[in-house]
Structure formats: C-alpha cells, structure tokens
Amino acid sequence: MNALRLVRTTHAGVADVDVRMMERAIHLARQAALNGEVPIAAVVYRGEEVLAEAANNREAHADPTGHAEIVAMRIAGQKLGEWRLEGCSMAVTLEPCPMCAGALVNARLGRLVYGATDPKAGACETLYSIPCDARLNHRVEMHGGVLAAQCIELLRAFFRERRAAQKAARDARKRSA
C-alpha cells in the first residue's frame, strides 16, 4: 500500500457534514480492522441524516461483493424502500473499485466523498473515471482526498501488521520443520 497517495484537491464543494461523515467512516474502518477485515468503510447520508453505514465484510461473510460501499448502499436502499439513492451522498475511506463505482452510478448516487486514492483498483480517478463517464446514464459528483492522510495511515498500519503476522507464522513453520 506504499503507493497510496494524497489527492491534491481544494475541497471546493466539500461541506462540514462531509468531513464529519468521513470521520464516522474512519471510525468504522478501524473497527473493521479489529475484525480482520481490510479497513474500508462507507456512510450513506442525506443532509445530516445517516441512512446507512458499513465496513468491508468480505472475510466474515465469504462474499466477494462485501465491499463497504455495496453493503452501505444495500442498507440505504432497504431503509428508503427504493434502490435509487438520488440526493444522497456517500463518504468512503478509499476510492471505490470498478464494481463499487459501477454500483454508485446504477444507484443514481448524488455525491461521492472519498479519502485515499487506490492505485491498484481506483475506478473514480486513478485508473478509471466511471462515476463521471459521460457515456453512462448517470454521473456522480466526486470529491477526493478528504481526510486522506488518516485513511492512508489506517490502511498502511493494517497491511504492515498483516505482513508482520504472516512473516512470524512463516518463521514459526520454518523453526518447527
């Protein structure tokens, strides 16, 4: 995750509520890390109202679609009784992947606020620009780099600890062999 980087942004269009929702997502991501999940979390909100929040749950549910964005949109849609999330915003700690970016468009999400860019799978700015692709039937307003340093450090710490644990397990196997 050393390639994670800060997005240069003026934060024009980012409101105080967006920062508060990102702080909430960061808190959820920390909890996910404690549960062995990659620390990514998302909050779906309309104005000041939180409609849904979720963290990655791929490991817990053995579900390849258990990304925070997908889970949060599913919960928001159920709460609203509607799959369209028009007028809603999402704060997510990492730039969405192609699957999640496509789901944002399909859900007609109004705005996306994300923290760190994703050099390996980022589909909003880094590798692709799915949410603002004029060829699609909906475009999502995007603001990247919100509290990016905190989001990056959370991911780096998680993977640093994971690598150390994997190395310790390998070393233990070598000693017992």
Language model regions located:
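Short beta-strand scaffold segments in enzyme catalytic cores
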Residues: I40-E48
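Short loop/turn microsegments at loop-to-beta-strand junctions
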Residues: V17, V38-I40
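Zinc-dependent deaminase
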Residues: M1-A32, A103-A177
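A short, polar/charged loop-to-alpha-helix boundary motif
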Residues: A60-I70
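Conserved redox-active cysteine motifs that mediate thiol-disulfide chemistry
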Residues: L94-A101, N106
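Immediate flanking context of iron-sulfur cluster ligation sites
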Residues: E82-E95
